[in-house]
Amino acid sequence: NSYGVKQNEIVIALGRVQSNAKGYAAGYVKENNTLENDVDISYDILETNIELKEDDYALIFGVNANLIGISHVTKVGDEIRKNVIGISSVKTLIEEMSSGIPAGSMGVKCTNITKDISEQFNFPEGIYVTEVEVDSPAYKAGLQAGDIIYEYNGGTVGSVQDFSDMILMSEKGDSVTIKLKRTGRGGEYRELEYTVKMGLRLD
């Protein structure tokens, strides 16, 4: 369970480490409980002090030999970011991939509405849509950036992780009902309902 990993906890990387296909390295968790929101999914990110190269890949284990994450090395401009994706945040994705049934895709990127943000901007409960991919199922259905999604097929959406799991449990061609709130010209929120025909998740 990667959600229980604490700061300064010892971790071990096994796999391709420092270009060694059978390499390993030990280190510790510098930061935990950081969320990275991507299209249709949210990752729990752990930052460690383990040095990895751009072409490295490794499984990350805790001191009790329990799998807690997968290395995630990306290059953004000239910067190489070396993080770990918490295994608990991608459990549903792994299960769906293992089943051989491709997961559905909606094409939205969202962020959680924290209590502070809700109070500061008077946002209702739900998750805030930051981006809708052009020509995605959500785009074709009418969803927009700025919408606040609070219900998915009758289920309450309390966090981006909830939403991600719901999407991953859907399949291509499924029609799902999305309830959301959208601000009008006067700043008031209108409740809207859309039917989205799910696409295919390719990664």
Task: Pin down the residues of each PLM region.
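Short, well-ordered loop/turn sites that connect or cap secondary structure elements
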Residues: 5-6, 61, 143, 170
